[in-house]
Amino acid sequence: FVSSHPMAGTEYSGPEAAIPNLFDQKYTVLCETERSDPDAVELVERMFRSIPMKIARLDPTSHDVHTAYISHISHISSFALALTVLSKEKDEGRIFELASSGFSSTVRLAKSSPDMWVPIFRQNRDNVLDVLDEHINQLSRFRSLLIKKDFDTFYQLIQEANSIRKIIS
C-alpha cells in the first residue's frame, strides 16, 4: 500500500466521468512513504509520472490542512451558494435564465456527489471547520464593508484577492 492522492478531478464521478488528460501535469500527493515497501513506492511513482503527473510528498497532517484550504472549502462554498440561489429560485422562476459563465463556474462543484463528500468532510472535520471559520470571517468583512458603504476598502480587498492570479494561472 502506498498512500496517495491525485490532486485532480471534476464534479462528476464514475467511469462515465473519465476525461482524457485530466491528470496531465497535476500533482499527486504521497504520504508516509517510509511506511510503504520501497518497491511499491517506486512503482507508484513511475505510474504517476507516466500519466504524466508531478509528485509531492507531504505528511498526512499537512495534506489534510492543505486540502481543506484548496478543495474542501471550495466545495462547501459551492454547495452553500447553490442552496442560496435554489431557495430564491422558488420565488423567481427565471433566475437561472440570467445566469452566465461566472455563476456556472462558481457552482460547478455543487454537482459533486454527497456519497463522496460527506465522508471527506467527516474525516477532515476539524481542518474544514478551521477553514470554514476563516471563510465566514472573510465574508463578514465584505458584509461589514457593504453595510458601512466603505467601497474604498472593499476595492482594496478585491485587489488583494486578485493577487491569487500570480499564484494560479
What does each model-found stretch correspond to?
Residues F1-E16:
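Rossmann-like NAD(P)(H) cofactor-binding subdomain of soluble oxidoreductases
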Residues E11, S36-D37, V128:
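Alpha-helix N-cap/loop-to-helix initiation residues
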